[in-house]
Regions:
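Active-site/ligand-binding neighborhood in enzyme catalytic cores
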Residues: 150-273, 282-283
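Glycine-rich FAD pyrophosphate-binding loop
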Residues: 21-47
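Active-site-proximal substrate-binding core of FAD-dependent oxidoreductases
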Residues: 513-568
Length: 802
């Protein structure tokens, strides 16, 4: 199998190695850090804090890790990293299980009460009470009605703009300009405009691209509106302990070679291909440092933009102009580095992240120990540390505090001034939440290096920011050098943000390019799209028509576009209700969805029998369930369920023959006369039959898969004898239909109907097992057969029971 050299052992490099090694490639990683993996995601052992035990250090970090609900690439990888137990053996769990949800987001302001909101919609009774309590005594944000209205209008514009407009027009507009920051109050700018960009992407609001900033804000909003999504997740311990070290162990156990303390210094080309890469080893020990040439079939460069720019030569640019653009992109970086305060009290402050919206240096923080379970701090440093407040500083270069920029301050001054901004934000109205006496120690990220010559700091690991018009400078994962690929957060991705998620996605794209180049038959690494609500799709389609005509965005949609969007919105709500029930009942997959729909159907019928809502409710239930099943089938491209829906519709239409015989032939079935009819049946009846047969038949299908067709058929026969008569009983008292009373009845249902419906259900497992494998047109054929089988079953049962 081909050998792949990966330059850079951060999240991008490790993600690429993960996908490659699982597909049988040989993988070598070269990482500049002499000890740690994971790049900027790493945690560290704070030097000199192992005073009480040689192996117990205080945990420090470049910056705290944050896993929003819209992250899908990196979390998918985490679900494939095994987690060892305390005995060193596989625990059966995955690293993903070390993610825990936060509960609230706090916005702390100078001299004003903090704003605290749930991190998403409440998903428990306790969270609901907290949310209602917060709304009842809610803190005034200081935003006017006009500002709130304008913010919502801007979000709606982003949500309903077509993809091309976002990629082209909004890439050229700064967030400041798009949000009309100059026209509103300082509070609006602080909370909505500047606060969001500085704390989320460490970017200046005036230069940050609306395409990127707007998309990320929308994703956070969408996550917050879905109670089954954990909007904000953190790790349950220091990053190395609970994620990166298990990841490295897994990769090396699979065969990845991981070389530390080494980085690339030159890319050597021959015949428009990389011949080899010159690596400098022993970086931390100059006396032992030496250059070596490493060879592979393919090369992935997973180093950050500033390092990659140093490797760009004139020869590279001659082969692919994208490398010239990389050099132009390299200055588009900002600083987002952390400082940790180790406190002699475990103060939670907030059950999640804290945004210091008025802080000059754009501070965000989280009190970490509350999420770390049984992590022991007692034997670390001086034994007095009880809590860790991890703070990210996102504005080092542009805004002054006490007339100085953060980059102009030595480490002690940075710590002092950051703490002052925290105190000003939290200690409000005479309440003392934090005070300096709590601090036992602090650790400033070692990437912040004080340079005595220039009397200011240097950041050794800055962060790429998505400034206006930077998308055009960013390369794809492939290059015109056929064995060279790029995997870093500056690569064009759906995520479009310098994050762990963007790095992981870029790595997957690079791996897919290698799979293509190698002609490998392995499956592609999965690429995820953003989860935009699909009920906006019609509005986006309309906006695309306007865009193609050269017209600007307009929120004045035609009435029919609004109407279709409202209808799709109703379907979206139904889908959301089902997802929430899945979340609460811990149901997953196709089987869970169909079984849950069966439970909801029975529950609704029972409630209707009690309340007697009448014929409209039967129509609503039938159509609603069919829509819910259709949404699931088409959203997840569930081919089997799509075929079952087609099968059910055909059965329902042919069943009208049997219904006519029951109504007009032997005259035992009576429907209310005040509803629209299709032949002798209510208009909804074909849909109702489709839903019920899918539900009952699927149960038989599941039983047949595990116990065999004979057992499945008998079980489905019994289910039909029980489920459908109960449904018939509910139908009578709900006012949907009823049977003419006779002596041969059980629960208001004639014996022959019960027997007939058992016979109907009995053959469904045979059909479903066959249909799973066969082509589409068999769904129609089977539907016709079962439709006639329904009539035959009733007719036979009628003659048997008299």
């Amino acid at each position: 199998m081909a050998k792949v050299i990966i330059i850079g052992g951060g999240v991008a490099g490790m993600s690429a190695a993960h996908e490659l090694i699982e597909r049988g490639f040989e993988v070598d990683i070269y990482e500049s850090n002499p000890e740690y993996v994971g790049g900027k995601a790493r945690s560290v052992n704070v030097p000199g804090t192992n005073q009480l035990h040689p192996d117990k250090f205080l945990p420090g970090e470049h910056g705290f890790r944050f896993f929003p609900g819209f992250y899908r690439h990196v979390t998918d990888t985490m679900q494939r990293i095994p987690l060892s137990g305390k005995n060193g053996k596989n625990s059966g769990k995955k690293v993903f299980s070390n993610l825990v949800p936060t509960r609230a987001v706090m916005v702390a302001r100078y001299g004003l009460p903090s704003i605290i909101v749930n991190a998403g919609l409440p998903n428990t009774g306790v969270n609901m009470k907290q949310q209602l309590k917060g709304l009842k005594g809610s803190v005034d944000t200081g935003l006017t009605k006009e500002e709130k209205k304008f913010f919502l209008e801007r979000m709606l514009q982003l949500a309903t703009s077509c993809r091309v407009r976002r990629d082209n027009d909004y890439e050229k507009i700064g967030w400041w300009e798009f949000m009309h920051a100059d026209e509103f109050s300082a509070t609006y700018r602080s909370l909505i405009v500047v606060g969001l960009t500085r704390t989320l992407v460490a970017a200046n609001a005036k230069s940050a691209s609306t395409k990127t900033g707007g998309s990320i804000v929308l994703q956070l909003i969408y996550c917050g509106l879905q109670p089954w999504v954990n909007t904000d997740r953190v790790l349950n311990g220091p990053t190395n302990d609970v994620w990166l070290n298990p990841w490295k162990e897994y990769l090396t156990r699979k065969g990845v070679q991981y070389m530390h303390d080494a980085h690339a210094v030159q890319i050597n080309l021959k015949d428009h291909l990389i011949d080899n890469v010159t690596i400098k080893t022993n970086l931390s020990n100059p006396e032992k440092a030496r250059d070596i040439d490493v060879n592979g079939d393919y090369y992935i460069f997973a180093c950050p933009i500033e390092r990659m720019a140093e490797l760009v030569s004139d020869e590279l640019i001659e082969n692919d102009l994208c490398f010239q653009y990389l050099k132009e992109l390299a200055p588009s970086v900002a600083w987002m580095n952390g400082i940790q305060f180790y406190l002699n009290q475990n103060i939670e402050i907030n059950q999640g992240h804290i945004i210091f919206s008025d802080s000059e240096w754009a501070l965000t923080a989280i009190s970490q120990v509350q999420f770390w379970g049984d992590y022991d701090l007692d034997m670390r440093f001086n034994g007095k540390v009880k809590g860790v407040l991890s703070v990210d500083i996102s504005d080092w270069l542009s805004t002054k505090y006490k007339d100085v920029l953060a980059e102009e301050c030595r480490a002690d001054e940075v710590a002092d001034y950051v703490w002052e901004q925290i105190e000003k934000s939290l200690n409000v109205d005479g309440k003392i939440i934090v005070e300096r006496s709590m601090i036992e120690f602090y650790y400033l990220d070692r990437d912040i290096h004080w340079d005595d010559k220039i009397k200011r700091n240097i950041d050794k690991e800055p962060l790429l920011v998505n400034s206006i018009n930077s998308w055009g400078l960013r390369p794809t994962a492939s290059t015109d050098i056929d064995n060279m690929f790029l995997a870093a957060d500056y690569v064009r991705t759906n995520t479009d943000l310098a994050t762990m998620e963007g790095a992981n996605e870029a790595a997957r794209r690079a791996v897919n390019c290698i799979i293509d180049a190698e002609g490998n038959k392995s499956s592609y690494a999965q690429i995820f799209e953003f989860n935009d609500p699909w009920f906006f799709d019609v509005m986006k389609w309309w906006d695309r028509r306007r865009y193609d005509k050269g017209l600007p965005y307009s929120s004045k949609f035609p009435w029919w576009v609004k109407g279709v969007s409202i209808l799709m919105g109703l379907f979206f709500v139904i889908d959301g209700i089902f997802k929430y029930l899945f979340y609460k009942l811990r149901i997953t997959g196709e089987a869970g969805y169909i079984i849950l729909s069966m439970v909801v159907t029975l529950g609704f019928a029972a409630l209707d029998a009690w309340k007697g809502w009448g014929t409209w409710s039967a129509f609503a239930l039938s159509i609603g369930m069919f829509i819910a099943l259709s949404i699931y089938a088409f959203r997840l491209q569930d081919r089997f369920l799509k075929k079952l829906l087609l099968f059910g519709l055909v059965v329902g239409l042919v069943e009208l023959l049997a219904d006519n015989w029951l109504v007009n032939g032997i005259r035992v079935l009576v429907y209310p006369s005040d509803e629209p009819f299709l032949w002798a049946s209510p208009m909804y009846m074909p849909i109702a039959w489709a839903v019920v047969l899918i539900q009952v038949g699927y149960l038989g299908y599941l039983i047949s898969k595990s116990r065999g067709l004979v057992v499945g058929s008998v079980a489905t026969f019994i289910i039909g004898l029980i489920f459908i008569p109960v449904f018939e009983f509910a139908a009578k008292y709900a006012g949907w239909w009823e049977y003419i009373p006779t002596k041969n009845m059980f629960m208001h249902t004639p014996y022959f109907i019960i027997l007939g419906e058992g016979l109907i259900c009995m053959i469904l497992p045979f059909i479903f097992v066959k249909e799973w494998r066969l082509k589409w047109w068999y769904s129609i054929l089977f539907g016709l057969f079962v439709g006639f089988w329904i009539f035959l079953s009733y007719f036979t049962a009628y003659n048997i029971t008299g």
